[in-house]
């Protein structure tokens, strides 16, 4: 075994076959595994690792997508597509703290739900936090304890300001099992000139006996949609506390009445 360690870790396993260099190790493997750094352990603590994360400073909102409408800017007359997001009885339920959970976050609930449609576990959770049962619950991570909002606080559309940028998260529409032309925009093969039953095929999926397999990441038919999608730097066009809606520029992934999470844009703060 000592003779094996004198060379490379990939030593000769077959006669007259060399797989890599036979240069000796600079440090024996047994010694390398026992080397410890002189840096204090606090540099690698979960608290400092969490502090290094790029996180928003404020909590976010849960909204419901109601549809799209054109929006006209009064100052410039510019017309742009806008998505209308409804804010209905959004309330802070509880906190996550670094001392207990290892990170800071606010748990937020949307709307209200009848007691008969809430599981016993969630009923106990809402009762312990002294809030009414919610239709949807989500968690928003924040940078530190300054971003925590007192439980029971109702959040309104004015939580965001007109003109600011936000990150929008939602689940896209499910398209089912689709081919490569619909899923990835492949051109497909010829319609005629000898092409048979391969018109919408993806072409070659591999090479030859070497490597003898389909390489990872190959674009192939499969389930399309129903994925978590984040759109960054979306502009807030209008905030309406009277009607409890937020207008954001452009489209948002997901069908109507789907839940959408909004938080301050991480790349604009």
UniProtKB/Swiss-Prot annotation:
GO terms for biological process: mitochondrial translation. Residues 1-19 form a transit peptide. Keywords: Mitochondrion, Ribonucleoprotein, Ribosomal protein, Transit peptide. The keyword Transit peptide applies. InterPro entries: Ribosomal_uL3 (IPR000597), Ribosomal_uL3_bac/org-type (IPR019927), Ribosomal_uL3_CS (IPR019926), Transl_B-barrel_sf (IPR009000). SUPFAM superfamilies: Translation proteins (SSF50447). Transmembrane segments: none annotated. It is found in: Mitochondrion. GO terms for molecular function: structural constituent of ribosome. Its main location: mitochondrion. The keyword rRNA-binding does not apply. One of its GO terms (cellular component) is mitochondrion. It holds the Pfam family Ribosomal_L3. Component of the mitochondrial large ribosomal subunit (mt-LSU). Mature yeast 74S mitochondrial ribosomes consist of a small (37S) and a large (54S) subunit. The 37S small subunit contains a 15S ribosomal RNA (15S mt-rRNA) and 34 different proteins. The 54S large subunit contains a 21S rRNA (21S mt-rRNA) and 46 different proteins. Present with 3200 molecules/cell in log phase SD medium. Component of the mitochondrial ribosome (mitoribosome), a dedicated translation machinery responsible for the synthesis of mitochondrial genome-encoded proteins, including at least some of the essential transmembrane subunits of the mitochondrial respiratory chain. The mitoribosomes are attached to the mitochondrial inner membrane and translation products are cotranslationally integrated into the membrane. Belongs to the universal ribosomal protein uL3 family. PANTHER family: 50S RIBOSOMAL PROTEIN L3, LARGE RIBOSOMAL SUBUNIT PROTEIN UL3M. NCBIfam families: L3_bact. This is Large ribosomal subunit protein uL3m. It comes from Saccharomyces cerevisiae (strain ATCC 204508 / S288c) (Baker's yeast).
